[in-house]
Amino acid sequence: MPSTFDSKLFLKTVSSSPGVYRMYDEEGTVIYVGKAKDLKKRLSSYFRVNLPNVKTQALVSHIANIDVTVTHSETDALILENDYIKQYMPRYNVLLRDDKSYPYILLSDHKHPRLAYHRGPKRDKGSYFGPYPNGGAVRESLHLLQKIFPIRQCDDLYYKSRSRPCLQYQIGRCSAPCVNKVSDEEYAVQVKLASLFLKGKDLQVMTELVSKMEASALALEYEQAASYRDQIAALRRVAEQQEVSNTSGDMDVIGAYYASGVACFHLLFIREGKIFGSRSYYPSVPAETELDEVLSAFMIQFYLNSDSQRTVPKEILLSHGFDDLPELERAIQTALEKKVEIKTNVRSERANFLRLAVTNATNAVNTRLSHKNTVEQRFLLLEEALEVSTLIQRMECFDISHTMGESTVASCVVFDREGPNKADYRRYNINGITPGDDYAAMKQAITRRFDKIDKNGKIPDLLFIDGGTGQLRIAQKIVDEKFVDIDKTPMLIGVAKGEGRKPGLETLIYGENEQSFTIPADSGALHLIQHIRDESHRFAITGHRNKRQKTRNTSTLESIAGVGPKRRKALLQYLGGIQEVKGASVAELAKVPGISLEMAQTIHDSLRG
């Protein structure tokens, strides 16, 4: 492999998101295009010591550069990969392989058929619709079908055990054939219509529903006619949404992201509804420039550049608005002598395209901020600003996150001279403190981090505390205690938010003497501090949200001895939810499959306290 390509450095900048990668040779020719569910995992596999086959060895030996485009889903990655393969015809692309089975929607062959998610061998009798690109697409379709056709989606065990309608019947998403709330004939009609809809025969479904509504009205069956009317309305809403989401025509989609002095504009070029290509632009941004000014300057220079010979589409989607946008739109129309619309508030597929562009812009900025040369330069500037005599090799930053004291989590992120060192990131679940006590939370986190530290451990040269003097003082006290017998001691610095929490106005505080100081807003040293502070905040809040969601999702049934996952599922499905389980009598609990009278009594007593 050419020495100009550093795979280790490159892999540190790659995320674990789904996406597409393009490999180039020394002449800049695309030699391979691939997709991955996890870009980091897939790309890492190319640079193992023992590669699996000769083709891969030959491919890797010609790699001079790799370009990555993040997508929101594997489906987006697949579409973009196909487009790139058609465009570049790379010599190492032979075929597209996917060893995973594709999911389907199953319309079962029962007296009262059900709609269900299916993946794997088609052993069950019934009609299969698909394949769908992924499980999410199937679940979204099933959710949509529930709104239009009141067909059951429950499994057979749940269906056979019902003695009363479930919640789906009460909200109008199932006709409850399990307890004879609908005739077999009418249920069969709905099954037929759902089957036609899944085959794409929307017009035929609409025609039949209108015919049945009119027939019911003539027969004075007004309630049934009203039901058909509601179905027609739901079907029309879906048709309208599909018309918007099936995007056609040409668009430029621009996602912007600006952080720590680096701006990126990621453009998706949509032609005839497909992603034709993408490109990132990095304008040079003077210090303390507002985002509005960056946006305006880029749009003007990009679209009013007569030398570029670019074809400007009639529709431009932009992730952020700014004050001069209407004027810019008029200027472009005047220069091009045609109508051009710049939109910032869009929905459906257009919104998905915008999110995709912003994701790629964000990823590009983070990659730039993580780049070795950029980080190295900022480390040097930080050493100069702090007037330290030795190199800063390792920095750590702590932050606390909670919601009104709930599910408190502390984060510790680590930067070295190549940027974020995610392998050393740590989260600490904070317990045993007064809810909302950030000082106690910080004390616990710092104590746990350095509890068994010795001279051979990973000792940071700099330790940043995201907070004011109070939290910094506690952290300094813990560090002084833990490092009493160790020669090397980290320098502590507090990062206090500035007025209005605006970046560039932060106040820095030395932990040793609590003296405050500032660094110019346009300094790379401050940008480095902002980067590690923001990363610590992101890592803390992500952990907090996950912990909070897990806590809130934990059913009270889990605390009852003898009630495992299968029994919990049976109880919740049979009775319709946790509130119904709590309100059930011992006799009602005992009717649930797998629940004995003795177990029913235990559950009843436990829930009633």
Curated annotation (Swiss-Prot):
One of its GO terms (biological process) is SOS response. One of its GO terms (molecular function) is excinuclease ABC activity. GO terms for cellular component: cytoplasm; excinuclease repair complex. Keywords: Cytoplasm, DNA damage, DNA excision, DNA repair, Excision nuclease, SOS response. Its main location: cytoplasm. It is found in: Cytoplasm. PROSITE patterns: GIY_YIG, UVR, UVRC. Gene3D superfamilies: 5' to 3' exonuclease, C-terminal subdomain, GIY-YIG endonuclease, UVR domain, UvrC, RNAse H endonuclease domain. It comes from the Bacteria. Residues 203-238 form the UVR domain. Residues 16-94 form the GIY-YIG domain. Transmembrane segments: none annotated. PANTHER family: UVRABC SYSTEM PROTEIN C (PTHR30562:SF1), UVRC/OXIDOREDUCTASE (PTHR30562). NCBIfam families: PRK00558.1-5, uvrC. The UvrABC repair system catalyzes the recognition and processing of DNA lesions. UvrC both incises the 5' and 3' sides of the lesion. The N-terminal half is responsible for the 3' incision and the C-terminal half is responsible for the 5' incision. Belongs to the UvrC family. Interacts with UvrB in an incision complex. This is UvrABC system protein C. It comes from Shewanella sediminis (strain HAW-EB3). The gene is uvrC.
